[in-house]
Amino acid sequence: MDVMVLEGDGIGPEIMSSSLKIMDVLRENYDLKINPIRYDIGAKTADEGKWTLEKILEAADPYKAILKAPMGDPKLVGESGTEKALDIILGLRFHFDLYANVRPVRLLPGIASVLRGIDDKNSIDYTIVRENSEGLYSSHFGGMVLRDSVAIDNQIVTREGTERIVDMAFNLAEKSKGALSSGKRSVTCVDKSNVLKSFAFFRKVFDEVAEKHPHVERQYMYGDAMTQYMLLHPRNLNVIVTENMFGDILSDLGASTVGGLGFAYSANLSMKKGMFEPVHGSAVDIAGKGIANPIAMILSMGMMIDWLGFSKDRLVLEEAMFSAIRKDTKTPDMGGGAKTAAFTEQIISELLNNS
């Protein structure tokens, strides 16, 4: 099976290279039947005119799965002042209707949390399901500035969009082991229904969909309150479902509790297509230094492997990574001194020893 690989910008090509080296080992020594097709696509190549959004979408169309490295460069902005990379990222999401952004918040073995009382024995493991096709971010291609005096962006919440994202959240909860503190399966609706009609509608549809999932508990929390709850009681959480921008913000906060964005991985899903990517950016300030943490990229690849039906290979991959971390082969952001290449080679060594 062919998958599309987008190499991105900044540290993107470096951490993608690490991931694909590991994929090669899985292909040669395990059961993985995936063939990566690499494309030098990112904000830089788009800015240089090598790739237009239309050409990128056309190239991506035949693939069921896309593995995407971080894209973007703060220096590359369009006339509106927004980064050019967003045209590619949001273009892919909207064009292929990748409506569900699934972002696990998971503390890996051997990684320290900034939260008191959280460790390997009292860990963190929940999932944020972010509506990915509407909400406030749907204004990216349609916001306006009037007479250089007023800027307007609109939030869009539809019944169809809300029903399908909430249904996915409940389905994930049903398949999960529940909250770490209690084992209870639950979905928490995060909104500002006390202020905005769009969020009140989101909650109304949430309740309607919840009726179809009687074995999963429903919970509610306002977006501002959830920022505190995620820090104080993360082990009580199972699945969170929320609007586009709230999901973006909350998942970054969640990442800070499990080691940082270097450990934040994600999937953008529709019924027929998936795009898998780290949550973090392209970190152009450390590009080329060989010190980037590739874990989020590798775990995103693991999500893709699992989604394509190779769940055993994902488990093998993750166990090899955990072994590498336990042996203190850590990049600087993890408190170690290893280079990206050394960490990658340690994972490969673990895979080969267990094959």
Residue ranges of model-derived segments:
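Buried hydrophobic positions in well-ordered alpha/beta secondary-structure cores of metabolic enzymes
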Residues: 9-12, 64, 129, 169, ...
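Accessory "access/gating" subregions that flank catalytic or transport cores
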Residues: 194-205, 209-253, 257-262, 351, ...
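Glycine-rich phosphate/nucleotide-binding loop
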Residues: 43-45, 104, 229-329
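N-terminal beta-loop-helix "entrance" segment that forms/cooperates
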Residues: 31-54, 230
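Buried hydrophobic packing segments
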Residues: 19, 23, 297-305, 347
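N-terminal glycine-rich phosphate/adenylate-binding segment common to multiple enzyme folds
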Residues: 46-152, 245
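Flexible, glycine/charged-enriched surface loops at secondary-structure junctions
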Residues: 31-35, 177-190, 213-221, 310-318, ...
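Glycine-rich phosphate/diphosphate-binding loop of Rossmann-like nucleotide-binding domains
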Residues: 4-21, 25-27, 147-222
